[in-house]
Amino acid sequence: MEDKYIGLALAMSSSLAIGTSFIITKKGLMDASARTGGTDGVQASDYLQNPIWWGGMITMAIGEIANFAAYTFAPAILVTPLGALSVIIGAVLAAIFLKERLGTLGKMGCAICLMGSVIIILHAPPDKEVQTVDEILGYATQPGFMFYCTVVTLYSLFMIYKIVPKYGNTNPMIYLSICSSVGSISVMSIKAFGIALKLTLGGNNQFTHVSTYLFLIVVALCIVTQMNYFNKALDQFDTSIVNPLYYVTFTTFTLAASFILFKGFNTSSAVDIISLLIGFLIIFSGVYLLNISRSESPMVDRDREIFGVHTSKDMAPLDNGVGGFSTVRRSMQINRTSEYDNEESVGLRRFDSFEIDSGDEDTRNYRH
């Protein structure tokens, strides 16, 4: 069997495990929060003692190991987009176990994601032949990729120390942008270390090369950072928001990193390149439909898109990396529009509790 199809099977298995792990982890965090009364947040001692949370972590570890192996056998341009399958699995399981809504648009989104995945599978090129891990180090030390790594490092440090403490609990993209940008470097390092293992098992020992250990250190640092901020996002925001956004941002950053590292997608066929781009757009569209279909209402979606406000748990992030849950929604401040005036006249209410602040003396509070 060709390496490409081995990687494909591993990637699909990985998506199944990771999609399931999102739900198990969320259930564990919810259970830990319930045990603490749901008001003071989830401390590390709470969720680390929760067997459900550990079940989610173990399932995710299995999925990540399969994903690790998939990058060894197949190119990132094939493996990464197939993460859409984990979004589909997460959506279906969230509807069943977390009682999150999956309507007609959600089902259409799932079907569209599958269609885009098939297109990518059919047109993904094979990986470049690599004889030693030092060859990948040579790619990684080229100016283009070094510049990319520098930008990611500076951006992540700025977000972690300046933005997260103040605004981390207001928008999931703050956490997920860190996860995704750092994750793109981890994928390249995982691929390098995986190839080193593959070559070593084939009789060409790569553990005599310093670069093998260098890639391993980068993998460890990046994964710790990813998991920390992914846990924060998952704890404070709905899975229907976190999963799709994480997929889109992680895929985009990873494909950009792969393109820069290997100076292209290892294909000269215009048909393949165009088909791959179309496949990505189709998957992104499906993920978007899946996201909006599981929101509370069209009005909430509109306000979220306009003002960048998402439903979050009413608790700032804690130092241990996992914030708390609350039964009270965060009130959203939005500018008054004539549409709300019309809705007021017929007695409609779109939110359980929110404030409308026009910024002048005509400030009103709406309560359900």
From Swiss-Prot:
It holds the Pfam family Mg_trans_NIPA. GO terms for cellular component: early endosome; membrane; plasma membrane. It is a multi-pass membrane protein. The keyword Amino-acid biosynthesis does not apply. Keywords: Cell membrane, Endosome, Glycoprotein, Ion transport, Magnesium, Membrane, Transmembrane, Transmembrane helix, Transport, Virulence. InterPro entries: Mg_trans_NIPA. GO terms for biological process: magnesium ion transport. It is found in: Cell membrane; Early endosome. Glycans are attached at residue 266. The keyword Metal-binding does not apply. Residues 1-4, 72-76, 123-143, 197-206, 262-269 are extracellular. Its main location: membrane. It catalyses: Mg(2+)(in) = Mg(2+)(out). Disruption phenotype: Leads to sensitivity to both calcofluor white and Congo red. Residues 26-50, 98-101, 165-175, 228-240, 291-368 are cytoplasmic. GO terms for molecular function: magnesium ion transmembrane transporter activity. The chain crosses the membrane at residues 5-25, 51-71, 77-97, 102-122, 144-164, 176-196, 207-227, 241-261, 270-290. Belongs to the NIPA family. Probably acts as a selective Mg(2+) transporter. Plays a role in cell wall integrity and in engulfment by host macrophages. This is Probable magnesium transporter. It comes from Candida albicans (strain SC5314 / ATCC MYA-2876) (Yeast).
